[in-house]
Design a protein with these regions (language model features):
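C-terminal cap/substrate-recognition subdomain and adjoining C-terminal extension
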Residues: 5-9, 14-17, 24-245
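Metal-dependent phosphoesterase signature
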Residues: 1-2
């Protein structure tokens, strides 16, 4: 995402401790975070022993994966959410059990949901920061538990171009083409706590169809308007990424 490298550099320059907690498989997560300047010990991700798993699979297993992948590529991830869920539910819960592929998949433990909260707890203990002093940024259902944990502790739970599962659990939202646009919220929170963040959001309010960034106060509010704005920016970010190849 545009602005990611600049945000990391800014946070480091300002003395922040930064970690990455992601459901992404380790092969991609390590490579990406290394490019952003994060050391491996500050990254929690999903272990995926690819060579070990490949050795357990046959042609029929790989054909099943190819078939589901082809079906997924035909779906719009935003507009076909129910079809996406039904397709994956049928594959994981009906087709895979009892097969070599199913047994291999069962050994993979994604870092999402409660495992993200556990990983955050480990970083918090290592750095001796209470959760009330944390800023967390998330965008999807795999982030909802860690967003809620930081929100409920009094920290800053930022939803960036999030879906409704994340928006329901954050206390603030940012819809933008650049990740750097979370920085004004972080600074407002540092200076004035959650009240400071809320004041910035009020000052920066704009019509839903305006260019970004858009800032939203989410805690205790109807997220319908924010959800529409965030969905628009999710699509825009994906279009930019697709254009870049």
């Amino acid at each position: 995402v545009k602005g990611a490298r600049e945000l990391m550099e800014r946070l480091a320059a300002d003395g922040y401790q930064v970690c990455c907690i992601t459901t992404t498989y380790e092969q991609y997560a390590r490579r990406l975070t290394q490019r952003l300047g994060l050391p491996a010990e500050q990254v929690a991700c999903t272990a995926f022993p690819i060579e070990e798993l490949r050795a357990r699979l046959g042609d029929a297993d790989m054909a099943a994966v190819d078939r589901v992948e082809a079906a997924l590529l035909k779906l719009d991830m935003e507009r076909d959410e129910e079809r996406l869920r039904d397709l994956l539910d049928a594959f994981y819960w009906q087709e895979l059990p009892g097969t070599p592929l199913g047994e291999a998949v069962a050994t993979v433990k994604p870092v999402g949901g409660r495992r993200k909260v556990q990983a955050l707890g480990q970083f918090a203990r290592a750095w001796q920061f209470d959760l009330s002093r944390w800023v967390v940024v998330g965008d999807s259902i795999t982030d909802n538990a860690v967003l809620a944990a930081v929100r409920d502790a009094g920290g800053l739970a930022i939803v960036f171009n999030g879906n409704r599962y994340a928006l329901e659990r954050g206390n603030v939202g940012v819809a933008s083409l650049s990740l750097m646009d979370v920085m004004p919220l972080v600074e407002a929170w540092e200076d004035g706590g959650l009240d400071g963040a809320r004041q910035l959001i009020s000052r920066e309010a704009k019509p839903p169809d305006a260019d970004g960034p858009h800032y939203h106060w989410l805690a205790g509010t109807d997220i319908a308007e924010a959800s529409e704005v965030h969905a628009r920016f999710r699509r825009l970010v994906r279009q930019v990424a697709a254009a870049l190849g």
